């Protein structure tokens, strides 16, 4: 079963890569540029075409169709779970995670989905008011209502109106190379590591940059490889990967890790690689994963660094995002071509805007998490031969209360995370980990965001331990209490 699953996962990924390339040929922009296109394209018909092409990837009944592939994957996963004595694949997968079972995850996601959808409905009202003005001006057909392909475009208009924030104002201050240096500065300030550029190391592509991380005494922490630029053969998304993990060898030597962050940031035709606010957060996010791998001090590689429970692994990446727009860190990297540091007024607007559109953002993420869980709560007696993927998705979305203007962040036929990347019954982990991340950051805020004692405790309690101890035990040691889920809702502006 495992061999068949590995082959099918690879096929799913290959099909999706082909579909991504087909999307670019049809629409004229790469998949990595889809969010920017949907935000800036003034032609509603083109936005609709792009949305429909994007949201139907892997679902064209052609050689790259993923419906049959994912159904075979689920059939085998349910069989495997049954053989191992579990009711479904979700309970099997979650047995050794922080959540422990599907019921706990379902309850958690429902507690997030309600406030998220309520906020999203408010956001629709605000966008519709602006669309109505476009209707009066003749720019949009009479009677038009906000559709999924309108959301990014009109959300940006609302953001400009409510926060007077235009990404064209911020991007000149977020040059990729400078943002990367800002990420490094934050790590140096928090954890005492020193990061320097190094040349002459073997790389798999000329665009990859290499860096050496050292402790204050000069001892090696690890080697970092930064692969941030879009390429035609690179799949979408962003991730951290280990070329070598930390461990102690048979002779007692501490073997240090080699880690890469891989992304597709900026526009292919932009030589300065100016980043959006979301892309800046991505750079901080992925380096949070890297720090988890670099700062670990474990004997065995199987529990070092990011080798932790799936619903714990995103804690440190998301936690690292909290420093992206702190004034002290912005001063180290956010300056334009003339060397001018980003003005305080713009920083205030950025931080105010971070809670903007969170009804949508949280709803689409939570919806994808619920879709993932419902797939993996299916049992081995499911009638796979007559299974209708579209009908299943529609019912799941209706049952969770998702509004028509939003679709899950990933639909099944291009949900690479759960069918090819090990996040099966685990996509909820981003939200689960965010509870820990936001609760921990609230503690930092109380004590001072660069408080050396708190940072030292965080490093020694969490980052150095990897997966060698129960995550909740470690969290309680650091925080002195269980994480508060309301911290996530507060951080996203879903509650006061």
Label the predicted regions:
Residues 265-284:
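Short pre-active-site segment immediately N-terminal to the catalytic Zn-binding motif
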Residues 51-71, 453-462:
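A short, flexible low-complexity segment enriched in Lys/Arg and Gly/Pro that occurs
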Residues 1-33, 38-42, 71, 76, ...:
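Active-site-proximal, well-structured secondary-structure segments within enzyme catalytic domains
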């Amino acid at each position: 079963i495992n061999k068949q699953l590995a082959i099918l996962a690879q096929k799913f990924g290959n099909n999706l890569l082909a579909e991504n390339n087909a999307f670019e040929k049809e629409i004229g922009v790469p998949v990595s540029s889809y969010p920017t296109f949907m935000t800036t394209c003034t032609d509603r018909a083109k936005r609709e075409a792009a949305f429909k092409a994007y949201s139907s990837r892997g679902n064209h009944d052609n050689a790259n169709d993923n419906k049959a592939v994912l159904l075979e994957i689920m059939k085998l996963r349910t069989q495997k779970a049954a053989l191992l004595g579990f009711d479904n694949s979700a309970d099997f997968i979650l047995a050794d995670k922080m959540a422990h079972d599907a019921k706990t995850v379902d309850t958690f996601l429902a507690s997030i989905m309600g406030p998220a959808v309520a906020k999203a409905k408010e956001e629709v009202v605000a966008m519709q008011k602006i669309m109505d003005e476009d209707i009066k001006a003749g720019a949009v057909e009479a009677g038009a209502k906000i559709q999924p392909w309108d959301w990014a475009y009109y959300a940006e208009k609302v953001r400009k109106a409510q926060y007077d924030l235009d990404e064209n104002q911020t991007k000149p201050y977020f040059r990729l190379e400078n943002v990367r240096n800002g990420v490094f500065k934050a790590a140096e300030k928090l954890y005492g590591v020193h990061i320097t550029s190094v040349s002459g190391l073997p790389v798999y592509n000329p665009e990859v940059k290499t860096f050496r991380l050292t402790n204050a005494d000069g001892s090696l922490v690890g080697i970092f490889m930064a692969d941030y630029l879009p390429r035609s053969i690179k799949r979408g998304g962003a991730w951290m990967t280990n070329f070598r993990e930390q461990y102690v060898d048979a002779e007692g030597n501490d073997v240090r890790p080699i880690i890469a962050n891989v992304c597709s940031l900026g526009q292919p035709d932009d030589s300065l690689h100016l980043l959006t606010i979301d892309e800046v957060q991505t750079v901080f996010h992925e380096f949070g994963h890297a720090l988890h791998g670099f700062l670990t001090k474990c004997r065995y590689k199987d529990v070092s660094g990011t080798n932790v429970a799936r619903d714990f692994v995103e804690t440190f990446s998301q936690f690292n995002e909290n420093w992206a727009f702190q004034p002290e860190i912005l001063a180290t990297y956010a300056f334009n071509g003339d060397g001018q540091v980003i003005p305080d007024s713009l920083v205030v607007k950025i931080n105010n805007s971070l809670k903007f559109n969170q009804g949508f953002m949280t709803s689409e993420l939570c919806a994808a998490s619920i879709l993932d869980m419902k797939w993996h709560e299916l049992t081995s007696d499911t009638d796979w031969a007559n299974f209708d993927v579209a009908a299943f998705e529609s019912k799941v979305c209706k049952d969770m209360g998702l509004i028509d203007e939003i679709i899950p962040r990933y639909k099944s036929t291009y949900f690479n995370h759960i069918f090819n990347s090990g996040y099966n019954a685990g996509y909820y982990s981003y939200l689960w980990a965010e509870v820990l991340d936001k609760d921990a950051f609230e503690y930092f805020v109380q004590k001072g965001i660069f408080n050396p004692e708190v940072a030292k405790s965080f490093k020694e309690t969490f980052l150095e331990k990897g997966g060698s101890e129960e995550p909740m035990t470690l969290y309680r040691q650091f925080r002195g209490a269980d994480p508060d889920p309301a911290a996530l809702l507060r951080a996203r502006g879903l509650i006061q």
